């Protein structure tokens, strides 16, 4: 299995964010926090990919 690409990770981050907002509104704070952490992790991975691409282009 190949590593996820930027587009996949951005879609995952967006999905996790949207779900967390719905969970916050519904009073499901613990689940919302978990989804926000998933979002942060996905965005961090996007940052790593972008950083690697920048180094490859030097």
How would you describe each model-predicted region?
Residues 7, 11-58:
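Short, charge-rich amphipathic interface segments used for partner binding and complex assembly
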Residues 1-7:
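Short, charge/polar-rich alpha-helical segments
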């Amino acid at each position: 299995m190949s590593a996820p690409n930027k587009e996949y990770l951005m879609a995952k981050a967006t999905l996790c964010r949207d779900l967390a907002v719905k969970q916050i509104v519904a009073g499901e704070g613990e689940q919302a926090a978990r989804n926000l952490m998933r979002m942060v992790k996905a965005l961090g991975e996007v940052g790593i990919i972008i950083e690697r691409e920048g180094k490859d282009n030097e």
